[in-house]
């Protein structure tokens, strides 16, 4: 295999900004919504045509509503200026989630809604022209009189969606889920089926496809003396396929929490979590562990999980993606306190549970100051783009973050500038970035405080045009 010099590798991927709305001037970016008051928590999904659809929570009318916008591959907004309102009923609507549909004709939009007083969950389908296809103001996912919180959603593979949430109908925090088809019809029981409704409280549900119309779920549970991570598989018709009270993901002593789950491509899943088995106090120093579970609910790796990182100090907020379309294992990124201030690290774990990069992870960004909330997307060339909030040079004087990103190849080599390249350095700070790949374009959206008013946050976006292939 021919290898080219590292200085050449650094030029293999050139960041190009397209014409027609996307500016190369630092701090400009593309305004998606600059309406009055705050716009928060953008979620982005491919429109199937090299562009993107972006949704957000919006307070322009005083209370919080949900809005949506579409942009093309040149950064041109295609719908109404400052977005289309999806729901503006009394009460609060927020926490938007967008799910792609297989025919590339728009998206399914899920949100949390208090129109009835207590928080419920609703959904709407939007076509490529911004037209609502289901009932005006959305169809109910769950309207139980108790509260429904922290929704997560995935595509069901058949133009529908599966949603999971935390639910208080039993006077404790349980987990329920619902499947809705492409026509907006609930397939499972009214107000959802129980993923787990036993003793104690369950937190932070995560889900992934089982590739047969159902889903695999992961969560952490405080009903046991030590907090545990559990998993469950529910079939396309809403039946539990694993133990009634869930499968124990890790049997090690100590507490576990904050799991993330992703398909293994064989109707099973990879699960990553924060692990406190080596914590000398309580929830002060977390390690990161992982497990693979097959379609039958059997653990394939060590019953205690395999180590991603067990450095001294604290590792948190793991975020995962596949290595490639053939799965190939998972790439994990996290923030890491091993060097006083938190930095960004990453690791590739193959399908057999073996770390493929440096022990305890590769440094992605070790710049001065804090780096937090890393996320990542696969770049379709067996590489990965990692992006994060960055406080380099800010040791608490401003407490405002920029957004940086790094691209790494499958060997873990950084392809962009040391410690990442800036996506946005505008004054006022950036929050909650979310990104997707569409062909060879990375699209990223975020909430932005550049206008200087902490109560008037806007939505901005930018793109990076990548070369189509990383050379070995």
Which residues are covered by each model-predicted region?
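Bacterial N-terminal signal peptides
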Residues: 9-20
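Bacterial N-terminal signal peptides that target proteins for export
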Residues: 1-10
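Extracellular, repeat-based ectodomains that mediate carbohydrate processing or recognition
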Residues: 22-472
């Amino acid at each position: 295999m021919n290898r080219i010099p590292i200085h050449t590798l650094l030029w293999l991927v050139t960041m190009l900004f397209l014409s027609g709305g996307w500016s190369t001037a630092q701090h400009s970016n593309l305004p998606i919504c600059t309406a009055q008051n705050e716009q928060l928590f953008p979620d982005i999904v491919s429109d199937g045509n090299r562009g993107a659809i972006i949704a957000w929570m919006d307070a322009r009318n005083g209370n919080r509503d949900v809005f949506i916008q579409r942009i093309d591959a040149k950064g041109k907004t295609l719908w109404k200026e400052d977005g289309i309102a999806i729901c503006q009923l009394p009460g609060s609507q927020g926490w938007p989630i967008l799910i792609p549909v297989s025919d590339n004709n728009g998206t399914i939009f899920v949100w949390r809604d208090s129109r009835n007083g207590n928080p419920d969950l609703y959904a709407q389908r939007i076509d490529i022209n911004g037209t609502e296809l289901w009932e005006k103001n959305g169809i109910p996912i769950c309207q139980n009189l108790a509260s429904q919180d922290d929704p997560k959603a995935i595509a069901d593979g058949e133009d529908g969606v599966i949603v999971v949430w935390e639910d208080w109908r039993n006077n404790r925090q349980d987990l329920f889920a619902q499947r809705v088809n492409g026509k907006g019809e609930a397939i499972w029981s009214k107000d959802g089926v129980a993923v787990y409704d036993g003793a104690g409280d369950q937190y932070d549900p995560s889900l992934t496809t089982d590739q047969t119309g159902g889903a695999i779920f992961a969560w952490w549970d405080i009903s046991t003396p030590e907090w545990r991570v559990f998993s469950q598989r529910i079939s396309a018709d809403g039946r539990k396929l694993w133990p009634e009270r869930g499968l124990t993901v890790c049997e090690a002593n100590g507490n576990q929490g904050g799991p993330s789950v992703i398909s293994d491509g064989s109707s099973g899943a990879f699960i990553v979590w924060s692990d406190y088995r080596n914590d000398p106090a309580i929830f002060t120093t977390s390690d990161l562990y992982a497990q693979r579970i097959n379609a039958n609910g059997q653990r394939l790796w060590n019953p205690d999980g395999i180590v991603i990182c067990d450095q001294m100090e604290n590792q948190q907020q793991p975020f995962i993606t596949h290595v490639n379309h053939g799965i190939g294992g998972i790439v994990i990124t996290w923030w890491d306190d091993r060097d006083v201030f938190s930095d960004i690290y990453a690791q590739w774990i193959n399908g057999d549970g073996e770390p493929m990069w440096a022990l305890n992870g590769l440094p992605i960004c070790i710049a001065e100051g804090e780096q937090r909330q890393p996320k990542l997307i696969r770049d379709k060339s067996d590489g990965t783009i990692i992006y994060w909030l960055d406080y380099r040079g800010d040791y608490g004087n401003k407490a405002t973050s920029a957004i940086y990103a790094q691209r790494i190849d499958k060997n873990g080599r950084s392809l962009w500038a040391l410690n990442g390249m800036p996506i946005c350095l505008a004054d006022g700070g950036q929050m909650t970035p979310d990104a997707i790949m569409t062909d060879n374009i990375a699209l990223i959206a975020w909430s932005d405080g550049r206008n200087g008013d902490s109560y008037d946050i806007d939505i901005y976006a930018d793109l990076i045009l990548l070369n189509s292939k990383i050379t070995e």
